[in-house]
Amino acid sequence: MLRRRLAFRIGWTLLLALPAVLDAQGPSGVWQTFETPHYRIHHAPEFAEWARRAAAQIESIHERVTSFVGYAPGRRVDVIVQDPAATANGLAFPFLDRPAIVLWTSPPEAETAIGYYHDWAEILLTHEMAHIVHLVRPRNRPATFLQRLSPLPLGPIMRKAPRWLIEGYATLVEGALTGSGRPYGTFRPMVIRRFGLEGKLPGYGALSSVSGWAGGVAPYLVGSTFLEWLEAREGKGSLQKLWKRLASRRGGDFTRAFRAVFGDPPEDLYDRFRAEMTAHALAEEQRLEKAGLVEGELWQKLEGATASPQVSPDGRRLLARRVPRPERGLLAVWDIEETEEERRAEERRREREEKLLEDPEEVPEKPAQPRPRRPKWTLPAIDRGAPREPRWMPDGERVL
């Protein structure tokens, strides 16, 4: 089990790094370096100013992160600054012998989960540094023979912790130390509330999933909220106790260490968390209804993420970018009003329904609300994401 879990985590780390490896400047390129007491920041000449700003604040961020996590790495960390895909991202490689961070300079769009921030370099450094400081804590006992033979020296927390905890904790740190990011934006509470209202908060077994739209956001958004809930329930400093227990002589596996600190298995406490989040969402919905809040009419229920909605200048069409599944972005355009084809299809459905209901043993079939509507046009993305900031041209016939 340990070997399979470790292989998965190593594979996942390398998979995340693949775009950077393929698209970024190679080792033979022109590299420049800023050095600080704990970091080496490597960059191509075109990123010199961005790297200089990062170097100016990296030691103060280091001091805050190490104090918050409760551990300070002994090795200097290499930081690589690049922008291979013109999108917001970062990577952390928590190897015990040579930890490294990769920072992509393009900032996120405002409507994304991490779109609420004050300084992109600060929040990106805080999140990725949290990974390093959190995960390079070594064992406080000698390594086993098999662990000494491992080609990738990883600490006990990296080997034992599930993905939701790894990403959730870095997300928690990014918010706690910057006052921005996912914990302070509107996207995270919106997702938690919507999932709660629909009874779709992921089960514990799916919390670390990498498949589906929820798999892309759940470890960050739901995982960080669960960790905040755990520490509020158990008391300040309880998460630091968990990290120490995982690296201790009697640490055991993750479930055993978690139970030693919080008193119950993670699955049981997560079920309690889900119940509370659902109850809070329903109570808030009822409160807003009593206050007379009108949310508007639901037009479509779509799988995955939908962003950048924009009505055409003539008011006849709706443009939006869609990410129905991770790395499956597209642009979609709908007719706002019901089309003649849709009207005929609805008439045929009603005629079939009326004919069936002539049989007294049949019961009427309630149609889906809102009725699903297919886009008039779609344009798949040619890369791993969706086009950024699509908008109508003035003629209302073309999209930029």
What role is predicted for each listed range?
Residues 309-317, 389-398:
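Blade-terminus and WD-like Trp-Asp/Gly-His loop motifs, strongest in beta-propeller folds
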Residues 283-305, 334-391:
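Multi-bladed beta-propeller domains
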Residues 9-23:
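Bacterial N-terminal signal peptides
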